[in-house]
């Protein structure tokens, strides 16, 4: 069993950031300047419509753990990601930044990784559409 100075349990959410015009926001019916939850169908439509996107692992616990790890402590994170491209990205990015991703991806191949789609307007305003698809490690089977 590995030992950590700090181990966090939280929601694994990929932050996906893209520059977007006001006309794009209007066309996609995204209300400017707010955060809104979206269902899976709308979330996948919005994600696929994002051009030139940047991605980063996110979620408040994961961000905190990454910061602690940057100070030199041994860190681990427990959270659920889908068995998909974004899940692999999340896991790899956390580990490349020095934080162990402790648990396995969820087996349900049809459940995608959670994502926060951040549309940044020309004036710097952020409009966020959040697709939550999996909770943090919410049962004893999630952790060895």
Named regions from a protein language model:
Residues 9-11, 80-83, 120-122:
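Cofactor-binding loop segments of dinucleotide-utilizing enzymes, especially the Rossmann-like FAD-
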């Amino acid at each position: 069993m590995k030992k950590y100075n700090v181990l966090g349990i939280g929601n694994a959410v990929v932050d996906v950031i893209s520059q977007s015009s006001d006309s794009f926001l209007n066309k996609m019916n995204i209300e400017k300047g707010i955060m809104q939850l979206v269902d899976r169908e709308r979330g996948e439509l919005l994600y696929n419509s994002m051009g030139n996107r940047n991605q980063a692992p996110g979620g408040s616990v994961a961000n905190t753990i990454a910061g602690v790890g940057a100070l030199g402590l041994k860190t681990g994170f427990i959270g659920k990601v889908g068995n998909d491209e974004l899940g692999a990205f999340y896991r790899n990015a956390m580990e490349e930044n020095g934080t162990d991703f402790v648990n396995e991806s969820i087996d349900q191949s049809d459940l995608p990784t959670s994502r926060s789609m951040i549309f940044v307007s020309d004036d710097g305003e952020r409009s966020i559409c959040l697709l939550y698809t999996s909770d943090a490690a919410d049962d004893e089977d999630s952790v060895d």
